[in-house]
Regions:
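Ser/Thr/Asn(+Pro)-rich, low-complexity disordered segments
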Residues: 61-524
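Boundary at the C-terminal end of the N-terminal hydrophobic targeting segment
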Residues: 17-19
Length: 524
C-alpha cells in the first residue's frame, strides 16, 4: 500500500492503519500532517479539496542488507526470534501486582521511573545500543508468539535515549561511569549511520543500521540536538564529541527565509524541502525553533512569524479566536488572540494533544522562562484536558495524545478537539500524556497516574502500557520508545526538581534562546 493510499484510507477508515507496520503508518501519519499543515491564510481547505500531495511521502527505502539477512534465516517471520534475541532484555510477566504498587504520589512516581527505565534498558539492540521503536506483547502472556518487535528507530527516540541516560544518572539508577559508557556506545553507533549535510535521516533499521527513509525531519533532528545539549551539560568528558555533532547541524537547512518558517523537512531523493511548514507556534516543534535561534542559524523573527491563532475567516477551526489583534513583542509585530472554553483561555495547538502541548517541557521550564505565554498556556491545556475528559466525554480518567489503539495493533491521533485549531478526536487515554503533566500540575498528574494503575490492568513489568480504552478497559499491550522515554524523563524531572530542565537551560544554545520567549503575554 502506498503512503498516499494509506493516508487517505486512514482518514476515511482509521482501522486501515492496522494493516501497515508501525513505521510505515508513522510515515503516513506524518504525510497526513503535512497535507493538513496550514499557513496563516486559510489554505487547509484548498489543500484537502485539491488533493495536493507531498511527492516524497510515496517513496519507500528498502533495507537491502536487512532483507538479505532475513532471507538467510528463512524469511521475515523466521527472523523474528533472532530479532528478539538481539534485545537486552524481556519482561517475565505481563502485569505487575497491582496491590504491591505504592500508594503515595512520590513513591508511585519513583516506582514508575525505575520500572520505565528497566524497560528502556531492555528494549535496545544490544550490539548497536539503539532503542527499538516498539515492542507489542500478546494479550495472554509476555513471552507468547504474538509478541512483535519493531526493530527500527527514529531520530527523536535516539535523542530521548541520550536524555534518559542522564536522567537515570540523576536518579541514581546508574552511576556516572556506566552512564558515560552508555552514551559513548550510542555516539559510536551514530558515527556509523548514514547522514546528509550534517543531519541524520528520520528512520534507521536497528539490526542492519541502514536508513529506511529518504526524509530528514526538522522536529526530529531538533530532539537529537536537545539530547546532545543535555549530555554535554551533564558529562564534561563528552562535551567535545557532542559539540561536533551539534555544530555540524546547521538549521538553515530547513529554514524558508521568504516565509520565515521552518520546513517540515527535506527529501534527499528529490533534493528538495518539504512543501509544508510548521506554522503553528504552540506545537512540539517550538523547541526546534528555539534551538535553531539559539544556535544563531535562524533569526529570532522566525519565532514571531508563527501563528498564535488563525483568522476568524478560517471556518474549519474548532473554536472562533478571541481578541485577535496586532501587537509588538521585542520589536516584532505579530497577531495574537486565544480560544476560550468554559472560562479557560489559551493559545491552541494543532490537534489538541498533550504531546504537542507539553513535550518541549521535558527540557524547557516554560513556567519559569515564559510564565505569561507558554507557561500559562501549558497550565491551561492541562486543565482543559482534565475537564474535557471528565465533564464532556464522561471518562473516569484523562490524558489524550497520539498513542496505540487498544482495539487493534495500530496507532491513532487523539486529543481534545477544543484545544486544537483543527483538533483530533477523542479515543484512548495514554499514560504518557498524564506523565507529561507532572511538570505542570504535579499533584493532579501523580494522583491520576495512581488512578490509572488502580482502575485498569495497564501497568506491566516495565511500567505503563501505551494506552487504555477508558470505556471498555481494553489495553494496548505495547511499549513505544517515544512514549516510554517521555514518561521516564517527566518522572525524573518530578523526582529531581527539574534536573533535566536545568541541564538544558545551562547550555549556551538554550541560554541565548530563552531571551526570546520571556516578554510575550498570550492572554491580556
Amino acid at each position: 500500500m502506498s503512503l498516499r493510499l494509506l493516508a487517505v484510507a486512514c482518514l476515511l477508515y482509521p482501522g486501515a492503519a492496522a494493516a501497515a507496520p508501525v513505521h510505515v503508518w508513522t510515515e503516513a501519519r506524518d504525510f497526513v500532517a503535512r497535507l493538513f499543515s496550514p499557513a496563516e491564510s486559510c489554505e487547509l481547505g484548498e489543500k484537502v479539496v485539491g488533493g495536493r500531495v507531498e511527492p516524497g511521502a510515496q517513496t519507500v527505502v528498502v533495507p537491502v542488507k536487512k532483507r538479505a539477512w532475513e532471507a538467510s534465516l528463512g524469511g521475515e517471520e523466521a527472523a523474528r526470534p533472532y530479532i528478539r534475541a538481539r534485545l537486552a532484555g524481556w519482561p517475565a510477566r505481563l502485569l505487575a501486582d497491582r496491590d504491591a504498587l505504592p500508594r503515595t504520589d512520590t513513591e508511585f512516581v519513583a516506582r514508575l521511573a525505575r520500572d520505565s527505565w528497566r524497560g528502556l534498558e531492555a528494549f535496545i539492540d544490544r550490539e548497536h545500543q539503539l532503542p527499538v521503536d516498539n515492542v507489542r506483547l500478546g494479550v495472554a502472556s509476555a513471552g507468547g508468539d504474538e509478541a512483535r518487535v519493531g526493530d527500527y528507530t527514529n531520530v527523536t527516540s535516539i535523542g530521548l535515549r541520550l536524555i534518559a541516560i542522564v536522567a537515570a544518572r540523576e536518579l541514581g539508577l546508574v552511576d556516572e561511569q556506566d552512564a558515560v559508557g552508555r552514551v559513548r556506545g550510542l555516539l559510536d553507533t551514530l558515527g556509523r549511520l548514514e547522514t546528509y549535510d550534517g543531519f541524520f535521516f528520520n528512520w534507521y533499521d536497528t539490526t542492519s543500521l541502514e536508513r529506511t527513509s529518504n526524509f530528514i525531519s526538522f522536529v526530529d533532528s531538533s530532539w537529537l540536538t536537545a539530547g546532545l545539549m543535555v549530555v554535554r551539560s551533564a558529562f564534561p568528558e563528552l562535551h567535545d564529541e557532542c559539540t561536533r555533532l551539534i555544530e555540524r547541524s546547521d538549521y538553515r537547512f530547513f529554514y524558508d527565509a521568504d516565509r520565515q518558517r521552518m520546513s517540515h523537512g527535506y527529501w534527499v531523493h528529490l533534493a528538495a524541502r518539504s512543501h509544508y511548514h510548521y506554522g503553528v507556534l504552540y506545537a512540539e516543534s517550538r523547541l526546534g525553533s528555539l534551538i535553531a535561534i539559539g544556535k544563531g542559524d535562524v533569526p529570532e523573527e522566525h519565532w514571531f512569524r508563527m501563528v498564535r491563532t488563525f483568522p476568524p475567516a478560517c471556518r474549519w477551526q474548532s473554536l472562533p479566536p478571541q481578541a485577535r489583534a496586532r501587537k509588538t513583542v521585542r520589536g516584532h509585530a505579530l497577531v495574537g488572540g486565544w480560544y476560550e472554553w468554559k472560562g479557560e483561555r489559551y493559545v491552541p495547538s494543532w490537534g489538541g494533544s498533550m504531546f504537542e502541548a507539553l513535550m518541549p517541557t521535558l527540557v524547557l521550564d516554560e513556567a519559569r522562562y515564559a510564565p505569561r505565554s507558554l507557561g500559562a498556556n501549558d497550565a491551561a491545556h492541562v486543565a482543559v484536558q482534565r475537564r474535557y475528559a471528565l465533564e464532556e466525554l464522561g471518562y473516569p480518567v484523562w490524558g489524550l495524545s497520539p498513542s496505540s489503539t487498544p482495539a487493534n495493533d495500530a496507532y491513532g491521533e487523539y486529543g481534545v478537539r477544543v484545544l486544537g485549531s483543527l483538533g483530533y478526536g477523542a479515543g484512548a487515554v495514554t499514560p504518557h500524556a498524564v506523565a507529561l503533566a507532572l511538570g505542570v500540575a504535579p499533584a493532579e498528574a501523580a494522583a491520576e497516574l495512581r488512578q490509572l494503575a488502580a482502575r485498569y490492568d495497564v501497568y506491566g513489568e516495565y511500567g505503563f502500557y501505551d494506552a487504555v480504552d477508558p470505556r471498555s478497559g481494553q489495553v494496548a499491550h505495547a511499549y513505544l520508545a517515544l512514549d516510554q522515554a517521555m514518561t521516564f524523563i517527566a518522572a525524573a524531572n518530578y523526582l529531581t526538581d527539574g534536573s533535566i530542565r536545568r541541564r538544558f537551560a545551562a547550555d549556551p544554545i538554550a541560554a541565548r534562546a530563552l531571551a526570546v520567549i520571556g516578554e510575550e503575554r498570550f492572554v491580556d
